[in-house]
C-alpha cells in the first residue's frame, strides 16, 4: 500500500515487518531496498517503509525509490545473518519463506510457515466448546 500525506511524507506499507525483521526496531539496523520489478527506473520519491504491525514497525525511515505503486515488489538485498533466527510470530503472523538469489537463480531455502502450524497447539477447553 502507498499512502501520501501531503507536506508530511509518503508511506510504503509492506507485507512483513516487526515479526520477520525485528532488527530495525531493536538495533536501529539500516537497510537499502529497491523496487525489483522496476529496478531500472531512477529514484524520484523519498518514502518511509512501514511494516504490517500496529506499532514500532518502521523498517526503513527514509528511502529514495522510483514512485512506488501498489503491487510493486520491494527487494531488500540483505537483512543480516541472524534475521530469520530472530523472527517471531508476533501478532500471529506466520514466518515468510526465505529465498536465496545467486547467479540469476532464485531458490526457496526455507518454506513459508503455514497458518495451520501457528494454531496446531491451540486448544479450546471442553467447558467452553
Question: Language-model segments: which ranges?
Answer:
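Charged (often Lys/Glu-rich) extended helix/loop segments that serve as interaction or gating elements
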Residues: 1-129
Amino acid at each position: 500500500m502507498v499512502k501520501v500525506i501531503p507536506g508530511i511524507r509518503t508511506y510504503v506499507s509492506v507485507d512483513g515487518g516487526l515479526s520477520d525483521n525485528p532488527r530495525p526496531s531493536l538495533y536501529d539496523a539500516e537497510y537499502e531496498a529497491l523496487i525489483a520489478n522496476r529496478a531500472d527506473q531512477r529514484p524520484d520519491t523519498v518514502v518511509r517503509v512501514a511494516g504490517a504491525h500496529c506499532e514500532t514497525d518502521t523498517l526503513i525511515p527514509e528511502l529514495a525509490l522510483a514512485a512506488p505503486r501498489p503491487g510493486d515488489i520491494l527487494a531488500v538485498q540483505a537483512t543480516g545473518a541472524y534475521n530469520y533466527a530472530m523472527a517471531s510470530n508476533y501478532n500471529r503472523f506466520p514466518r515468510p519463506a526465505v529465498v536465496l538469489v545467486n547467479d540469476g537463480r532464485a531458490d526457496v531455502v526455507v518454506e513459508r510457515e503455514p497458518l495451520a502450524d501457528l494454531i496446531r497447539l491451540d486448544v479450546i477447553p471442553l467447558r467452553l466448546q
